């Protein structure tokens, strides 16, 4: 159950999210990259690579990671941490599936 102090926003239906591909979603002043992984889970992260600002929704997904399309930085979709030898992080967002809809919770 979602706490009354948080916001829950519908970002679409599950079937609208292509598996292993990113989708750009705008919520208020935030630009997010949303991914449906091969296991059916949904992940949402900040849509800019911390290195040079690459659009992560355009990156290649492998397992629990997205690779920045600009310089191939490997970023965890679980915690937003850039994998070594590079370093940095992006903000991650909680997602929630209710029925056929996907929600961003923040």
Swiss-Prot record:
CDD domains: Rieske_NirD_small_Bacillus. Its cofactor is [2Fe-2S] cluster. It holds the Pfam family Rieske. It is found in: Cytoplasm. The keyword NAD applies. Its EC number is 1.7.1.4. InterPro entries: Rieske-like_NirD, Rieske_2Fe-2S, Rieske_2Fe-2S_sf. Keywords: 2Fe-2S, Cytoplasm, Iron, Iron-sulfur, Metal-binding, NAD, Nitrate assimilation, Oxidoreductase. The keyword Repeat does not apply. [2Fe-2S] cluster binds at residues 49, 51, 68, 71. Induction: Positively regulated by TnrA under nitrogen-limited conditions. Induced by ArfM. Its main location: cytoplasm. Binds 1 [2Fe-2S] cluster. GO terms for cellular component: cytoplasm. It comes from the Bacteria. It is an enzyme of class 1 (oxidoreductase). Residues 8-104 form the Rieske domain. GO terms for molecular function: 2 iron, 2 sulfur cluster binding; metal ion binding; monooxygenase activity; nitrite reductase NADH activity; oxidoreductase activity, acting on paired donors, with incorporation or reduction of molecular oxygen. Associates with NasD. PANTHER family: 3-PHENYLPROPIONATE_CINNAMIC ACID DIOXYGENASE FERREDOXIN SUBUNIT (PTHR21496:SF23), FERREDOXIN-RELATED (PTHR21496). This is Assimilatory nitrite reductase [NAD(P)H] small subunit. It comes from Bacillus subtilis (strain 168).
């Amino acid at each position: 159950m979602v706490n009354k102090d948080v916001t829950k926003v519908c970002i679409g239906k599950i079937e609208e999210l292509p598996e292993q591909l990113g989708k750009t979603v705008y919520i208020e002043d935030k630009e997010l990259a949303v991914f449906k992984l091969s296991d059916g889970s949904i992940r949402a992260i900040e849509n800019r690579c911390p290195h040079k600002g690459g659009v992560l929704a355009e990156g290649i997904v492998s397992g629990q990671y997205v690779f920045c399309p600009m310089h191939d930085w490997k970023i965890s979709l679980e915690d937003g941490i850039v994998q070594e030898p590079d370093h940095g992080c992006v903000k991650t967002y909680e997602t929630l599936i209710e029925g056929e809809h996907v929600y961003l919770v923040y």
